Structures are given as C-alpha cells and as structure tokens.
C-alpha cells in the first residue's frame, strides 16, 4: 500500500504525537527505510518509457526557445547624459575624508575598466543584427539601428571610422587621447606634414576632421594629395606610390562599408571582395566634402579616377553613384512597390554618415563584429520600451573562455542579519547602471556590434536577390530588393524615422565605450563600484545604513524625517560624481524593505508576494504520475529553491528533484510527494535575524554514542547501531536543541556548522532541518568541547564550561566600514539625543 501523506508527515516527525526524539530520529538515518520510502513515493527514477512532459504551466525546458514577441511600437529608451566623473576618488574624499584601501582599489578598477580576452573571434557584418523576428525583419533592423544610434549619441558607443580611429559623442576622459596626425593637433594649428599624414600603421588614410587647413596645403587632384610645395614629387615618390596602392587595395576600405551599387570605371574598386563603398576614402581625399565641425559628411561620391579637379564639390548634391539608397532616385520605378517612390518623397535625405564630436586613435579594429544584437521587451512589466540584448557569449565558451572574477553575493542569513531592523527604508534607481562605467579604448576592438547596411541585410533575407553578383551596374539588380513587404515596412518606418532611414540604411561598426551587459565582467565591475559607493555613504552618515546589490541601492534611517534628509544629501552626492538617478522611480518602503526578491522587516525575511503567487500557480499546474522533463524540473527547482529556506524542511525536501536533474532523468511526482511539497510551501516561516549571545549548550558524538553539556548538566546516550560520524553529530545537535531549547549550540563538526543538511539520509535531513531551524552554531575545538567526555561515556569528568560568544556574521558582503549599531527604539518626538540633532552631519 502506498505511503499516505499523513503517515509520511508522522514519519518525518512533523506531527506532535511523535515518540521520544532519541528513539525516533536515529531511525530516519536508516538506509533501508530511506529506500523503502523512496520506492513508495516513486523517487527511484525508473527509466520511464511514457513520453515526457515538456511544459508545466509557464515552465518550459531551460534551453527551449521561447519565441520572443516583436512589438512594432517599441519605444527606444532615452539615455541621459551619463558621464561618471573622472575625479570620482577625489570627490569621495572631499565628501567623507580619506578612503579606505578597499574603496580605492574598487574605484580604480572601473576608472577605466579593462577587458582583454585571450582570443576574439570576428564575425561578418551580416551577423551584426540577429534575424530574431523573421516576420519583422526590416522593422527590427531599423529599430535596432535606431537603438544603436541613440547609444552612440549618448556617448555609450564608439563609432569605428577607420582601422585605427573612432569617433564618439559626449565628454572625453583623459585616457581617450584625441587623434593626432604625427605631431599635429586636431584643431589644425600646425600644418599636417606629409610624413605623418601617411604614417597610419595600416596604411589607410584617417579622416581629417577639419577640412580647411589641409585644403589650403594640398591642391585638389584626383587624389587630393598634391602638395603645393611639391614635397611629394621631391624625393618622396615611393611613399606617395605606396599610399596610392594602399588606397586601391580592394579589401582594405575603412568602415564606411557600403556595398556599392554602381559600376565604377575602375574594375578593382568595383570587384572589391568586401564591396565596401568609397565614401570614406572619397571624403578623406577630398576634404572639401567634410563639414567644418567634423560632424557629418555628405554621402555623395566623387569618382576616384576620372574626375577633373574643377568638378569636385561643384554640384550641390553631388553624384549619388555609391549610395544604394540615393541610387533609386534616378531610376524608373519597377512596380507600384518600387523603393524609388519612397526615395523621391524627400529632396534632401541628409548625410550618409555622421561623425562624433571627438576622434581618437584605437588599436587595429577590423570591419567585423564580435557579437550580435537584437531587441526584446525592457522587462516583463514594461513592454512599451525595448531593451538591447548583446550576445558576447563567445568570451564564455570553449577552451579560450575568460574565467570571470567571482564576487560575494550576500546569502539570505547575512542579508537578514544586516537589514532586518526597525529602520525606515527607500530604494534608489540608478538609470542604465552598466553604462556608467567607462571602458578603456583598447577594449573596443573586442566588443564590436554593428550592421552591414539595409541592402545587404535585405539581400541576405530575400532568397531571390542577386546582389552578390559582380554586375553591380545593372539597374534590374538594384531593383531586385524591391518588394511589397519592404515597401510597406519602409513607408511605415518613414513616419517614425523620416530622413534618418537613409542614415540607418548604411553600414556601421560600433564598439563599446562603457561596459556592455552581455559580458561576464560587467556584473562584477558593477558590484565592486556600487559596494564602494555605499561604503563611502555609510561612513559619511554613521547612523544610517546604505547597502547595494548590483544596481539596487537601499538607504535606511531611524525615522522618516531622518530618511528624507539622508535621501537629499545622498542623491546630491551621487549626482555630483555623475551617477544618474531616476528620481521618479525612488520607492519609499516604510519599515518593510523590498530587496532582491525578499521582504525584510524587523521580524525577519520572507519572499515577496509575487514569488509566493508563482509557487501557488506552479503547484496548481503540476501533474501527478506523469514523467516531467528534467529541464522543466530545473525551472521548478529554481523557483522552489528560492523559497526553500522559509519552509519546514528546507532544501533537503527538494533532494529527489535535484537527484533527477543530476541524472538527467524524467521525474514523476507521486500524489504524496506533491502533497508534502505543497503543504511545505503553503506555510512559510520568516528567517529571523541572528542575535549575539553566549553559547551555553554543547553537543558531541562518536559513531556509537552522543553527549550533551547543557549548563552544568551532562547527558549521554548510545545509538542502536554505529552511524557515520557526520550523521551522529547531526543527531547530537538535534537532541541538544530539543532538550535545551537553546538557539546557540556549540559543535566541533564542520558539516553541522555549515547548516547544509542535503548530504544526509533524505528523511533525516528533512526532519533535522525543521528541528534545527533558527539555531545558530558556534565552532568549539574537540579538545575544549565539554560534551566530548559524555559522548565517550564518561560522565564523571567535568571540563569547565567555555565562555564562547556568538557574533552574527554578515558574510563577505563588502561592508568595509562597519556602521555603528542602531539603537532599537524609535526616538521620542524631539529627544535631546535624537540623531537628527546630534549624530547626523550635513555633507
């Protein structure tokens, strides 16, 4: 007869009518009993032939591809002018005095952050934007491109200008050296010497941002490089020849990277394997086409070979031969859905390219990407805005993967010890926290994103296109990309983006200037940064508590008035160092702090309501007697594991599920096991804060017997059969707790001390978790343990009782500056010693 739920509860000693603990508990360690119960509850994981269940409620397999939903109305979030001040350490020192070594070390880590992987794989530009939404290819392309453009404008990305130069917007840092041509400054106070102009290490001309100074020195010829003084002709033939040949090397065009749609008279340029168009070279060799600010350049080609000097820049609009978009203007429409109808809507489509306010030299950056991007909903609660997902997973894979640094995450007990108090709380929202931390420009070539331009993208998606054919000149090839879908999509997008459609249809390569989210280094750096900032705040306001986990910052103070003053002072400080807070999202929690999925109050910690609701839904949909795919079990265990510390039996109750996942077997829930788990999770108990105290109760065991020292009283007992030493020690600790009721117990066993009962026999682990819930353990060496003699059967000898203090730990939660203890009572209305009047100093 299968084991009923009531019988199972009694077996686990969860009912009150159980017999004496010393007799009942050792029975649960019996291997035979554990096997029989596992068999009865169907926990033996037989190899089932029934088909597995791959979906339980919302849970599907961990690696199953849930189809993301594309929202054509996604808004691109705005990024404020985020610029973390470079003198951050000095500003913190002005605020709080000298910083501790830990704080300085952490702040230096991110000023600037460095990232040097062992190996970087480069992918073709076609893989820049992932075809995540096959039904909305064009729409997704433009929305992603707009998102990238927004990030570049906000100073979060560099734009690759050539193999060795990049441009960006926003305020420069001191390590971002402005691009110098040899000894010449950007602003062109001195002339550009020919030597330095040619000395780019890759042999590609870099774009002079200010055209006029060079123009005065160089006559405009087909190359734009004939010096008035005849320096090039005078003994420098070899170098100018080298420059000319490099300019003509087809595979080496800089990142203006547009597949050319027209036949040039020069065959080499036409057949270039990468088919990048010549706008960059054209722009560099004819500086008259660069605007004086170096901001935008007209995308109108000047043919390299046959243009006489007089025609350069003479047409206001220039020739459109190299721009795929503008070529449609001069062609006959091929159908009602020809793109020329859209291109003819506007006379001025704006520039082909934009350039940043600042230009810097970079290490060699190929015209490739190292990761793909796509858009998803910002979060489950906000589907109106999009979020950019960057896939740099190449750095976490294979033999050359980067092993990311580890950092301490506060465990539940540490968090409760630290934050469970009667303070008033609020949470601060740091907007785009990752994008605060600057990256060294040397990391840029490893973190490249971008797109190959609309024509290539459309060609790749539409199977009929012959754009890769070398016959670029034929118009019917140009019109091969015309289709009803593309026409309708572009017409709708035209209402959103207007003339920017032209800019976005060109290829672009961007590198990260601030840390991206898709790299394992980023969470580590963010955690170091926010923990150092909180440490500074805690020392500046000693009677308050500031704590952070990643971008979640919380502040606590003894009264609401105190908290308001603290909030003003801290936000002013954070804004003064360049940390951008979203003040609209500040949450005032009162006395129950919501943090990291928990509710933390003076009574302890519980999981937040939405997690409890999820667990209820999970149990409602959990099938009985049906094999469930182990990947779905991973999802179920993830959810139940979060709330396990709040249940009677804790993690040990989930061990059968863990075992099936490890064995990659399907799991079958028996009605009894499901009822047992369900009951466990319907009644959640708070995890309380540990209190300091003196240890008065000690436990010890040998494989054959146990001994207790409770105050001056000594007790001993024997086991029916010898037990493994860890099991015996755990039983002794349980007896000590049940006999004395003490919540601080001394033991010399490290496994009991760790409070992880998952490696014990299953039934014993479940029962012990409930008996020892809320118990704190203190380590006492065997030689000093007063319970050592009784456990060996010697009651007559009494070792003196130790005075062993227990101090609750906050783990390795990066609290370098200990805050002074907070008095537990609320102050009187205006008590003379109120922290507002005495301890609190304005910044």
From Swiss-Prot:
Pfam families: DNA_pol_viral_C, DNA_pol_viral_N, RVT_1. One of its GO terms (molecular function) is DNA-directed DNA polymerase activity. Its EC number is 2.7.7.7, 2.7.7.49, 3.1.26.4. The keyword Cytoplasm does not apply. Disulfide bonds: none annotated. The record marks 63 as: Priming of reverse-transcription by covalently linking the first nucleotide of the (-)DNA. Residues 262-276, 286-299, 307-316 have a biased composition (Polar residues). It comes from the Viruses. PROSITE patterns: RT_POL. It catalyses: DNA(n) + a 2'-deoxyribonucleoside 5'-triphosphate = DNA(n+1) + diphosphate; Endonucleolytic cleavage to 5'-phosphomonoester. Residues 178-346 are annotated as: Spacer. One of its GO terms (biological process) is DNA replication. Multifunctional enzyme that converts the viral RNA genome into dsDNA in viral cytoplasmic capsids. This enzyme displays a DNA polymerase activity that can copy either DNA or RNA templates, and a ribonuclease H (RNase H) activity that cleaves the RNA strand of RNA-DNA heteroduplexes in a partially processive 3'- to 5'-endonucleasic mode. Neo-synthesized pregenomic RNA (pgRNA) are encapsidated together with the P protein, and reverse-transcribed inside the nucleocapsid. Terminal protein domain (TP) is hepadnavirus-specific. Spacer domain is highly variable and separates the TP and RT domains. Polymerase/reverse-transcriptase domain (RT) and ribonuclease H domain (RH) are similar to retrovirus reverse transcriptase/RNase H. The polymerase/reverse transcriptase (RT) and ribonuclease H (RH) domains are structured in five subdomains: finger, palm, thumb, connection and RNase H. Within the palm subdomain, the 'primer grip' region is thought to be involved in the positioning of the primer terminus for accommodating the incoming nucleotide. The RH domain stabilizes the association of RT with primer-template. Hepadnaviral virions contain probably just one P protein molecule per particle. This is Protein P. It comes from Hepatitis B virus genotype H subtype adw4 (isolate Nicaragua/2928Nic/1997).
């Amino acid at each position: 007869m299968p084991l009923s739920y009531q019988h199972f509860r009694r077996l686990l000693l969860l009912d009150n009518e159980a017999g004496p603990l010393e007799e009942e508990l050792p029975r649960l360690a019996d291997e035979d009993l554990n096997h029989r119960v596992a068999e009865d509850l169907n926990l033996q994981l037989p190899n089932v032939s029934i088909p597995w269940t791959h979906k339980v409620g919302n849970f599907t397999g961990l690696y199953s591809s849930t189809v993301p939903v594309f929202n054509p109305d996604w808004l691109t979030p705005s990024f404020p002018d985020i610029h973390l001040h470079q003198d951050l350490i000095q500003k913190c020192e002005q605020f709080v005095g000298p910083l501790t070594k830990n704080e300085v070390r952490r702040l230096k880590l991110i000023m600037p952050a460095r990232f040097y992987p062992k190996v970087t794989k480069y992918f073709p530009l076609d893989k820049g934007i992932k075809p995540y939404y096959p039904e909305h290819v064009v729409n997704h392309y433009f929305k992603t491109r707009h998102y990238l453009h927004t990030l570049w404008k906000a100073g979060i990305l560099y734009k690759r200008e050539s193999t060795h130069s990049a441009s960006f917007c926003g305020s420069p840092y001191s390590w971002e050296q402005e691009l110098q041509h040899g000894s010449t400054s950007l602003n062109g106070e001195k002339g550009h010497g020919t030597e330095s102009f040619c000395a780019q290490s890759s042999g590609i001309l870099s774009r002079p941002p200010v055209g006029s100074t060079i123009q005065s020195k160089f006559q405009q010829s087909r190359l734009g490089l004939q010096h008035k003084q005849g320096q090039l002709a005078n003994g420098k033939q070899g170098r100018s020849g080298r420059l000319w040949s490099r300019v003509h090397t087809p595979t080496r065009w800089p990142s203006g990277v547009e597949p050319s749609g027209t036949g040039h008279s020069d065959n080499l340029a036409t057949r270039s394997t990468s088919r990048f168009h010549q706008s960059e070279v054209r722009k560099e060799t004819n500086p008259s086409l660069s605007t004086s600010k170096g901001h935008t350049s007209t995308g109108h080609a000047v043919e390299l070979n046959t243009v006489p000097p007089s025609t350069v820049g003479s047409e206001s609009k220039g020739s459109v031969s190299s721009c795929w978009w503008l070529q449609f203007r001069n062609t006959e429409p091929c159908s009602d859905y020809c793109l020329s109808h859209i291109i003819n809507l506007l006379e001025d489509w704006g520039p082909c390219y934009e350039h940043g306010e600042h230009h810097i030299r970079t290490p060699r950056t190929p015209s490739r990407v190292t990761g793909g991007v796509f858009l998803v909903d910002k979060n489950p609660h906000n589907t109106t805005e999009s979020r950019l997902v960057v896939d740099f997973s190449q750095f976490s894979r294979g033999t050359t993967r980067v092993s990311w640094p580890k950092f301490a995450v506060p465990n539940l007990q540490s968090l409760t010890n630290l934050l469970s108090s009667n303070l008033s709380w609020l949470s601060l929202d740091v907007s785009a926290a990752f994008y605060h931390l600057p990256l060294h420009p040397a990391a840029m070539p490893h973190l490249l994103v971008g797109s190959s331009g609309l024509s290539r993208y459309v060609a790749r998606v539409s199977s009929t296109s012959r754009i890769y054919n070398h016959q670029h000149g034929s118009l019917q090839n140009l019109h091969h990309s015309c289709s009803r879908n593309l026409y309708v999509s572009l017409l709708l997008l035209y209402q959103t983006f207007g003339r920017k459609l032209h800019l976005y249809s060109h290829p672009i390569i961007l590198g990260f200037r601030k840390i991206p989210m898709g790299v394992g280094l980023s969470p580590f750096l963010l955690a170091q940064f926010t923990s150092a900032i909180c440490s500074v705040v805690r020392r500046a306001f000693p009677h308050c508590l500031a704590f952070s986990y990643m971008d979640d910052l919380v502040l606590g103070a003894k009264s609401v008035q105190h908290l308001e003053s603290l909030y003003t002072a801290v936000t002013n400080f954070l804004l003064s160092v360049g940390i951008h807070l979203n003040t609209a999202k500040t949450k005032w929690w009162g006395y129950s702090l919501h943090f990291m999925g928990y509710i933390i109050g003076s009574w302890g910690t519980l999981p937040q309501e939405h997690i409890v609701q999820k667990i209820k839904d999970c149990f409602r949909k959990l099938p009985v007697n049906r094999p469930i795919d182990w990947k779905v079990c991973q999802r179920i265990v993830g959810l139940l594991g979060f709330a396990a510390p709040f249940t009677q039996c804790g993690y040990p109750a989930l061990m059968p599920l863990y075992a099936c996942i490890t064995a990659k077997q399907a799991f079958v829930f028996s009605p009894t096991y499901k009822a047992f788990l369900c009951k466990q999770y319907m009644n959640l108990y708070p995890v309380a804060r540990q209190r300091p105290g003196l240890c008065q109760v000690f436990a010890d065991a040998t494989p054959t017997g146990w001994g207790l020292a409770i105050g001056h009283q000594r007790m001993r007992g024997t086991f029916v059969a010898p037990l493994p030493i860890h099991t015996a020690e755990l039983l002794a600790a349980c007896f000590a707790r049940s006999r004395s009721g003490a919540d601080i117990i001394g033991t010399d066993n490290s496994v009991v001390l760790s409070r992880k009962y998952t490696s014990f026999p299953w039934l014993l682990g479940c029962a012990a978790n409930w008996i020892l819930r809320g118990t704190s353990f203190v380590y006492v060496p065997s030689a000093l343990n007063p319970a050592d003699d009784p456990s060996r059967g010697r009651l007559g000898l009494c070792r003196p009782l130790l005075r062993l203090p227990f101090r609750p730990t906050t783990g390795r939660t990066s609290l370098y500056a200990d805050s002074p203890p907070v008095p537990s009572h609320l102050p009187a209305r205006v008590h003379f010693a109120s922290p507002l009047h005495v301890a609190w100093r304005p910044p």
